[in-house]
Amino acid sequence: MAKLGKKILVLLALVILCLGMLPAHQVGKDRAKAADMQTFVKKLMKKKRIAGSIAVVHNGTVQVVSYGRAKKGLKNGAKNVVYPAASLQKQVTAAMVMQLMAEKQGSSKFFSQNTKISRWYPGLRGASKITVGNLLTHTSGLQIPEIEVDRGVTYSEAGAVNWVVNRLNQASQDAVGTYHYSDVNYILLAGIIRKVTGKSYAANFKKRIVNRLGLRHTFLIGKVPAKYQVAASYDYQNSKNYQNRRYLSKTRLSQLIGAAQLITTPSDYYEFVSALGTGQLLAPSTYRLMTHLKSKKTRYCSGFYIKKGGKVKLAYGALGGAHYASYYQLTSDNQNGIVMMINQRSCGEDKLKGIGYQILQKLELNTFSQT
């Protein structure tokens, strides 16, 4: 019996030793893969003359790779550097609208994707034919070509929304159901959030998104603490990096409530996207509704595009007059993909997505969309 007991103890010791060795071996492999990816991404960014920060997600693990400078004397990747997300904010606004749809069920403030926006905008011409779903899918027929032109005025939230309503009443409108990608739709949605809650968009954003997820590097323009630095944007020109430095003016961004005021980092934005449909921000059923609205006419729905038969999702954002660009593409389960926030480029949307696609191909061959 004593010998048998010793054998059992020896076997147990061997099992424990083996169990201890396997994770260490796996950790070594994972570290090697991470180092390989970091080298690959940095070399690619250098070759393509882009600077910024990219979150690379592999099997649910996030690795942030940064290259170049945020401004003179400050590198991308520093803890205090944040970036304009441009149109990537639209998904945030859509998520808050969906939260309110779910919360207000059974109350006098209940609304659905089919509710006409004349409830909140009785003075807007044609509002009795436009639904909340039309705004979320850019099928309202509304657009203002000059919506992103800096008017040189620092608008309050209400002032930005009211300007849009007044301008729309002066402009020609296409039939409801016509697809026009326009900030107008999401500015009106921001106004609805204000009217339904009786609180500012900023207050809702902080409560419903930032505080709920514990995001520490995510703000709206005008609300960025002094210790954080919004990266400057640059062009690559005449074989030189960091040319034509540009920032986005606060007056211009104040016009774009709900559409393009977001300041964040790739890792924080990934935290937001990956929380959708988990119960942290939206229940799975609410998230499914968010991505399958009846008014959807293209692959765009609620702030992003759904492609490859629902296997991947993506969005791109940029504002003219500066060199920033933001882009993400993730698998539907959020386990693999990238979030890019770029502050130097000399290429347009298609070429930047092409750079991203090279990273995506290294992650998961032939899984992601090229466009």
Question: What spans do the regions from the language model cover?
Answer:
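Short, Gly/Ser/Thr-enriched beta-strand-loop segments that form substrate-interacting elements
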Residues: L293-S332, V339-Q344
